[in-house]
UniProtKB/Swiss-Prot annotation:
Example GO BP: maturation of LSU-rRNA from tricistronic rRNA transcript (SSU-rRNA, 5.8S rRNA, LSU-rRNA)
Protein localization: Nucleus, Nucleolus
Annotated source species: Rattus norvegicus (Rat)
Disordered: annotated span: 1-106, 127-152, 361-428
Protein name, per record: RNA-binding protein 34
Biased amino acid composition, Basic residues: 408-428
Gene Ontology cellular component annotations, sorted alphabetically: nucleolus
Any Pfam family matching the protein: RRM_1
PANTHER family assigned to the protein according to its UniProt record, in alphabetical order: EUKARYOTIC TRANSLATION INITIATION FACTOR 4B/4H, RNA-BINDING PROTEIN 34
GO molecular function: RNA binding
């Protein structure tokens, strides 16, 4: 045990020696700042000299704490609503520039002034009503003028105003109208599916077509005009056929186009082609047919008069709005001989109704006959009886007698009137 204790003491002594030697070696190896200067000066160090080791100059400093990343707040475009305190401060700072409006004193009107004001307002209202009525009548007139009937188809042309919107009627020159009618043909019994392109191609072999106008159109709706219905192809469901006027650029082309009369343009539609200028001779070659069934069509009427002769055209007068027949129509033949045969069909039945067949008479001639009663229906004038007498005869005409004025004579005192006799004096 004593040996073990001595050994431990020895080991501890050796460790102490080694640690002291290490301290000395480290002191010898480490250079202190100012050690050379101290050796030259004899060991005296100036005040304020450094005592740190040289290794401290090259040693790395202690690591600082890493910087903390702080995000930058984003700027918002929305305006910040001011707080209640800021609003109160702003109201306090703003000076009161506007003065409060002064109250206007309202004058009290007397009874006479009130009556006068009421009369003036009533007159103003009456003037406004008159202006509105005039405007309404003007619109109705313009609408009625804008409508084109079958009879006015060739008498009136549509032209654009300066603004290019509203269309108005412009009457044509009579000479220009006559020349235009000579190169215009009437085409009847066309199907409702026929358009301008088809009709132009149908007549293009005879000459160049200037214009095509569809007539006898029944709109599908009451608000649509005839022209707009023809453009949009919106016809009445009961309408099966329409008519058209084809204007050629040359008169010869219109005459050649008459060859298409009776041609079949579609299944069940045999068209009628005639010159629009030949209206004077139609009256002699046509008959008036009355008491027609309202639902009759042109083909049925044509078949009824087919045995009389070749038919040029058949027309049934219809209601322009509903398309229902009005109960009468016209049949145009090629010659007057067929008219005599057609008149024999008077009181014949068609679809359960007895027809009334008579000659077609021009309305203008009929008016002239009614105005001149001396003219008979056959056109011959009645002979006027003149009273001519001989010289010896006692009777005289009123125009032949010429009288003379009588001269008044003054009565003489002694003259007696004729036929008077003296009255006997009464004896006293």
């Amino acid at each position: 045990m004593a040996l073990r204790g001595e050994g431990r003491k020895r080991k501890k002594g050796q460790e102490r020696r080694q640690s002291s030697e290490d301290d000395v070696g480290n002191a010898a190896t480490d250079y202190l700042v100012g050690q050379v200067a101290d050796s030259l000066r004899g060991g005296a160090r100036p005040p304020g000299g450094g005592t740190g080791r040289l290794a401290a100059l090259f040693s790395t400093p202690e690591t600082l704490a890493p910087p903390v990343f702080v995000p930058v707040p984003q700027e918002t475009s929305k305006k910040r609503k001011p707080d209640d305190e800021e609003e109160t401060v702003a109201h306090i700072k703003k000076p009161a520039l506007q003065e409060p409006a002064r109250k206007v004193k309202v004058k009290k009107l007397s009874d006479a002034d009130k009556r006068l004001a009421n009369r003036e307002s009533a007159l103003a209202n009456a003037d406004l009503e008159e202006i509105r009525q005039d405007q309404g009548q003007g619109r109705r007139r313009s609408q009625s003028r804008g409508k084109v009937t079958d009879g006015e188809a060739l008498d009136v042309a549509l032209s654009l105003n300066e603004d290019g919107r509203q269309r108005t009627k412009v009457p044509l020159n009579p000479e220009e109208e006559r020349l235009k009618n000579e190169r215009t043909v009437f085409v009847g019994n066309l199907p409702v599916t026929c358009n301008k392109k088809k009709l132009k191609s149908f007549f293009k072999e005879y000459g160049q077509v200037e214009s095509v106008r569809f007539r006898s159109v029944m709109p599908a709706e009451g608000t649509l005009s005839k022209k707009l219905a023809a453009i949009k192809r919106k016809f009445h469901p009961d309408q099966k056929s329409i008519n058209a006027y084809v204007v050629f650029k040359e008169e010869r082309a219109a005459a050649k186009a008459l060859q298409r009369n009776g041609a079949q343009i579609a299944e069940g539609f045999r068209i009628r082609v005639d010159l629009a200028s030949e209206t004077a001779s139609r009256d002699k070659r046509s008959v008036f047919v009355g008491n027609l069934p309202y639902r009759v069509d042109e083909s049925a009427l044509e078949e009824h008069f087919l045995d009389c002769g070749s038919i040029v055209a058949v027309r049934i007068v219809r209601n322009p709005l509903t398309g229902v027949g009005r109960g009468f129509g016209y049949v145009l033949f090629e010659n007057t001989d067929a008219v005599h045969l057609a008149l024999k069909l008077n009181n014949s039945e068609l679809m359960g109704r007895k027809l009334r067949v008579m000659r077609s008479v021009n309305k203008e001639k009929l008016k002239q006959q009614n105005s001149n009663p001396s003219v008979k229906k056959d056109g011959s004038k009645s002979k006027q009886r003149l009273n001519f007498t001989s010289k010896e005869g006692k009777s005289h005409s009123k125009n032949a007698f010429i009288g003379e004025k009588a001269v008044l004579m003054k009565k003489k005192k002694g003259q007696k009137k004729k036929g008077q006799t003296k009255k006997p004096r009464k004896q006293k």
